[in-house]
Amino acid sequence: MSEQVYLDLARTILEEGHYKGDRTNTGTYSLFGYQMRFNLQEGFPLLTTKKMPFGLIKSELLWFLKGDSNIRYLLQHNNHIWDEWAFERFVKSTDYTGPDMTDFSHRAQDDADFKVVYQEQMRLFNDRILADEGFAKQYGELGDIYGKQWRAWQTRSGETIDQIKNVIEMIKTNPDSRRLIVSAWNPEDVPSMALPPCHTMFQFYVNDGKLSCQLYQRSGDVFLGVPFNIASYALLTHLIAHETGLEVGEFIHTLGDAHIYSNHVTQVKTQLARSMHAAPKLWLNPDKKSIFDFDVADIKVENYESEPAIKAPVAV
């Protein structure tokens, strides 16, 4: 079963991982260079050993595919995946005049009183993003992250490259090409991004009427982030296969620094002690032909049964 390869990764890191410091000052157990393979013919790889919020996964992917990099669209779909990074930019600006939010991510974990204050400031921030278009334009923006690089890569001549549209056209017209690649890692833009791309580059491969995808991910938060990435890129593969008239093949997930944060170890052990359920099936609206026409209601998982969700703090 596909989920087992993910559980094997988590178990291997706990048993063999190296303890390392990190940018967030949380600490991680880490391995370098790990690959997982998921046969998409066997079902959709949405984890069942903990409940996964598929609504957030599909709305984030559609946000990327729109070429958007502002959290307003996500908030309109009740998706808070990127809130902390936009909020961090705001509280570091001269326009923020509220309570001290220094190191809010760690303080909210350790100080219950501060957590209440932080959550109220975050609520006010999100409400203002939704209500005030000008404020959203300034402080909801995350920089030239995934969507911008996928759909509007800036060239030296001032033009833009739509990598997603180009790769779809190449799959249709030259499926044997070894250049079916999309990159989100633009060294010139990295300093201006709220979070430089963790999933940096992906490549498609067509064989025997099936579309496969390999992702290279430079950094993988194995408990919180990687399960999202697996489902997101599996969904992307299905969507592009749908438009190009192909079946799905494999999703291959290659990780650089694969890590478990030190404050996620208990949660990972809880998950590893659980039993798996059968993989769900993915439904795509057959009336939609282009991936750019899909909305959240056009994508569903069917027969999804899982163990309960497991909460864990996000390292910002």
Curated annotation (Swiss-Prot):
<dbReference type="GO" id="GO:0006231">
    <property type="term" value="P:dTMP biosynthetic process"/>
</dbReference>
<feature type="binding site" description="in other chain">
    <location>
        <position position="23"/>
    </location>
    <ligand>
        <name>dUMP</name>
    </ligand>
</feature>
<feature type="binding site">
    <location>
        <position position="315"/>
    </location>
    <ligand>
        <name>(6R)-5,10-methylene-5,6,7,8-tetrahydrofolate</name>
    </ligand>
</feature>
<dbReference type="GO" id="GO:0004799">
    <property type="term" value="F:thymidylate synthase activity"/>
</dbReference>
<dbReference type="InterPro" id="IPR020940">
    <property type="entry name" value="Thymidylate_synthase_AS"/>
</dbReference>
<keyword id="KW-0808">Transferase</keyword>
<keyword id="KW-0545">Nucleotide biosynthesis</keyword>
<feature type="binding site" description="in other chain">
    <location>
        <position position="229"/>
    </location>
    <ligand>
        <name>dUMP</name>
    </ligand>
</feature>
<feature type="binding site" description="in other chain">
    <location>
        <begin position="218"/>
        <end position="221"/>
    </location>
    <ligand>
        <name>dUMP</name>
    </ligand>
</feature>
<comment type="subunit">
    <text>Homodimer.</text>
</comment>
<comment type="similarity">
    <text>Belongs to the thymidylate synthase family. Bacterial-type ThyA subfamily.</text>
</comment>
<dbReference type="GO" id="GO:0006235">
    <property type="term" value="P:dTTP biosynthetic process"/>
</dbReference>
<dbReference type="InterPro" id="IPR023451">
    <property type="entry name" value="Thymidate_synth/dCMP_Mease_dom"/>
</dbReference>
<feature type="binding site">
    <location>
        <position position="221"/>
    </location>
    <ligand>
        <name>(6R)-5,10-methylene-5,6,7,8-tetrahydrofolate</name>
    </ligand>
</feature>
<feature type="active site" description="Nucleophile">
    <location>
        <position position="198"/>
    </location>
</feature>
<dbReference type="InterPro" id="IPR000398">
    <property type="entry name" value="Thymidylate_synthase"/>
</dbReference>
<keyword id="KW-0489">Methyltransferase</keyword>
<feature type="binding site" description="in other chain">
    <location>
        <begin position="259"/>
        <end position="261"/>
    </location>
    <ligand>
        <name>dUMP</name>
    </ligand>
</feature>
<feature type="binding site">
    <location>
        <begin position="178"/>
        <end position="179"/>
    </location>
    <ligand>
        <name>dUMP</name>
    </ligand>
</feature>
<dbReference type="Pfam" id="PF00303">
    <property type="entry name" value="Thymidylat_synt"/>
</dbReference>
<comment type="pathway">
    <text>Pyrimidine metabolism; dTTP biosynthesis.</text>
</comment>
<keyword id="KW-0963">Cytoplasm</keyword>
<dbReference type="InterPro" id="IPR045097">
    <property type="entry name" value="Thymidate_synth/dCMP_Mease"/>
</dbReference>
<dbReference type="InterPro" id="IPR036926">
    <property type="entry name" value="Thymidate_synth/dCMP_Mease_sf"/>
</dbReference>
<protein>
    <recommendedName>
        <fullName>Thymidylate synthase</fullName>
        <ecNumber>2.1.1.45</ecNumber>
    </recommendedName>
</protein>
<comment type="function">
    <text>Catalyzes the reductive methylation of 2'-deoxyuridine-5'-monophosphate (dUMP) to 2'-deoxythymidine-5'-monophosphate (dTMP) while utilizing 5,10-methylenetetrahydrofolate (mTHF) as the methyl donor and reductant in the reaction, yielding dihydrofolate (DHF) as a by-product. This enzymatic reaction provides an intracellular de novo source of dTMP, an essential precursor for DNA biosynthesis.</text>
</comment>
<dbReference type="GO" id="GO:0005829">
    <property type="term" value="C:cytosol"/>
</dbReference>
<dbReference type="GO" id="GO:0032259">
    <property type="term" value="P:methylation"/>
</dbReference>
